[in-house]
């Protein structure tokens, strides 16, 4: 049975990862695809490290944002804050190269959420992978 695609809501306009009004932000918009969220991103020179390469810190930010959205969306709206994240860089991401970002919620308890995310090229080559442990926000 096909899964209906849903776009995740904006929680803030100024977020570096997803805020549409942040002039230097990534402006990521995630879609729900069954048991994961996904988005696409094509890096520009604004996010360059070495000439022609996406900065590793931006890769970390993209993975963190994706895992945060997976945690929020796939747990039916629980807000959580990243407590620990691990990133494994596999291949360089090139400026101007379209990237696919996917993330999923892997574990949920009352106080903790765990998520994983992957950044890959269109041909399926994995650029980076990440995992995170997030603490449920006390306001939830």
Regions found by a protein language model. Give the residues of each.
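Hydrophobic core residues within well-ordered beta-strands of beta-rich domains
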Residues: 26, 35, 81-83, 99, ...
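Non-catalytic linker/capping segments at the edges of enzyme domains
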Residues: 1-46
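Active-site helix/loop of acyl-thioester processing domains in fatty-acid/polyketide metabolism
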Residues: 36, 54-77
């Amino acid at each position: 049975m096909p899964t209906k695609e849903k776009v995740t809501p904006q929680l803030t306009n100024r977020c570096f990862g997803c805020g549409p009004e942040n002039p230097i932000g990534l402006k990521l918009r995630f879609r729900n695809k069954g048991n994961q969220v996904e988005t696409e991103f094509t890096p520009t020179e604004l996010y360059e490290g070495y000439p022609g390469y996406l900065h590793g810190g931006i890769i970390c930010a993209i993975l963190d944002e994706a895992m945060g959205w997976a945690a929020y969306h796939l747990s039916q709206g629980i807000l959580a804050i990243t407590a620990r994240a691990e990133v494994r860089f596999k291949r360089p991401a090139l400026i101007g190269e379209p990237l696919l970002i996917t993330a999923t919620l892997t574990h949920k308890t009352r106080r903790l959420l765990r998520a994983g995310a992957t950044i890959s090229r269109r041909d399926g080559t994995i650029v980076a992978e990440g995992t995170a442990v997030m603490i449920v926000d006390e306001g939830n």
